[in-house]
Amino acid sequence: FENILLAVKQKRSILKMLFRKFQSNSSESSFVYQTLNQLSLETLGTKVASTLSHGDKRKLELAMALAMGPKILLLDEPFAGLDQAESSKLIELLKSIKKNMPIFLIEHDMQAVFALADKISVLNEGEIIESGSVEKIRRSKLVQNAYLGGDL
C-alpha cells in the first residue's frame, strides 16, 4: 500500500494521486480515466484513500498498476485480508483483466487460484512440487498432503 499510504498521509484525492504521474500528457490522463472506469472506480476519484474499504483499496492498487501500461500483471497475495464478498468481486475483476493481459498470481487462497488460473505451479519450501491444470492440481495427492492433509 505504499502509494495509497502516501495519498492518505498527504490527504490527496485519488485522482490527484493518479494524475500526479501524468500531469503533462493528456492522452495518459485519459488513460487514467479509462482505467478507473474499467475497474468501476470512477466514483472513487474524488475520495481520499483513507476513506476506502479494503477491497476498494485493492482495486485502486490494480488501477495504479494498470495505469502504467504493463504487458503482464504480477500480483502478490491480492486476496490477503479481504472478506468473501470482496474476494469474489476481485476475482471477477481479475477474470475480466486476464482476457487482455496475462496475470502471474502468487496466492495462498487455493479457491481464488482455482477460480482464476489456467495453469498452476505449487511450491513447497521453495521447490515446485506440482504443475499443471486446475484439475490436475485439485487431484494431486502431493498437493493435498502438502497443504491440506486431504481433499481440495
Task: Cite the ranges covered by each PLM segment.
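Conserved ABC nucleotide-binding domain
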Residues: L15, T35-D56
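Hydrophobic anchor residue at the start of the ABC signature
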Residues: L62
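Catalytic Walker B motif of ABC-type/P-loop ATPase nucleotide-binding domains
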Residues: L73-E77
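Helical segment within the ABC ATPase nucleotide-binding domain
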Residues: S88-K99
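A short, surface-exposed alpha-helical micro-motif characterized by mixed small hydrophobic
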Residues: V113-A115
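ABC ATPase "signature
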Residues: S131-G132
